[in-house]
Curated annotation (Swiss-Prot):
InterPro entries: A/G_AdeGlyc_MutY, DNA_glycosylase, Endonuclease-III-like_CS2, Endonuclease3_FeS-loop_motif, Endouclease-III_FeS-bd_BS, HhH-GPD_domain, HhH_base_excis_C, HhH_motif. Its EC number is 3.2.2.31. The active site is at 37 (proton donor/acceptor). SMART domains: ENDO3c, FES. It comes from Buchnera aphidicola subsp. Baizongia pistaciae (strain Bp). Its cofactor is [4Fe-4S] cluster. GO terms for molecular function: 4 iron, 4 sulfur cluster binding; 8-oxo-7,8-dihydroguanine DNA N-glycosylase activity; adenine/guanine mispair binding; metal ion binding; oxidized purine DNA binding; purine-specific mismatch base pair DNA N-glycosylase activity. GO terms for biological process: base-excision repair; mismatch repair. [4Fe-4S] cluster binds at residues 190, 197, 200, 206. The lineage of its organism: Bacteria, Pseudomonadati, Pseudomonadota, Gammaproteobacteria, Enterobacterales. This is Adenine DNA glycosylase.
Amino acid sequence: MTTLVFYQTILNWYHHFGRKTLPWQIKKNPYKTWISEIMLQQTQVKTVIPYYCKFIKRFPNIDTLSDSPLDSILNLWSGLGYYTRARNIYKTAKILKQKFNGIFPNSYAEIIKLPGIGKSTAGAILSFGFNLYSCILDGNIKRVLIRYYSININNKYIEKLLWKTIESITPIYHTNKFNQALIDIGALICLKSNPKCNICPLKSTCKSYLNNKLFQINCKKNKKHIIPKTKYWFLILQYKNYIFLEKRQNLGIWKKLFCFPQFIRQNDILSWIQKNNTKIKKINILNEFKHKLSHLTLYINPIWIIINKISIFSNNNKTIWYNLNNPQCIGLPTPVTKIITKIKKFNTHHE
């Protein structure tokens, strides 16, 4: 297949089958492209869509985003995971407001300097947001290239090789359609396992398909590593319709999110209660549950304590009494949200 035929084949497939109605593809602009690309990092499209729609409705532009508190951004991000992305969005919004007057720069050199934006994301912003020539190398495109050219994934220079490859085949014209087509072929056809080669527009010249190597090629090297496990005790302190939460600081997991007081040892909970002169009305020990992070597996043991009166007062920067009936706009980790939902259901059934 010649280079020209290769382009025409991909663009023709995109015309008939490519995705063109995703929320960030409608009335697209650099801001929408940026937000969607950050959300799509390590997260599937179907998961991102509802989060993206809520986010854009609340923060329709750079100004509204940069003028809002970080807590409101983390609130809409709650449940999406990888919260560093949200914190980087906030940092970038501030930079764009202060340095670029709220206008997204169309220079690769400027975009690549912004927090949380790497080479491929910068390329996506330029290609999809500005309709400029720029290469993209996300996980989907990597998979297509590795299979199409039958690239050895054990090559220690594979990243450089893939960039060199995509740079050599990305056309100057209709770059955005070409990029989106490769992404879609990777996402819809050239799957991690059980690729749908029978409907792939590139199968007639795909080296892996022709050499029957499809199931020997993965886009990631197989790395065997043991994910550490940690046990946490969560103290759920409730007074009427309020629950006590602490803001996590800059160390460890869930930075800047609000969480129940956490303990490594169960005995530390008693010490905490005594230290804060907490008057206990009732204690409920909830079932342990597992929560997986990318680098850690947590075994969470919630202890739910009903108290007679508040002995700890809110400090807006560090602690709050979370209103179950009228929740504050703050970021919450998924395990905290799950527990709060259970408590609200329990309270509703026992009113």
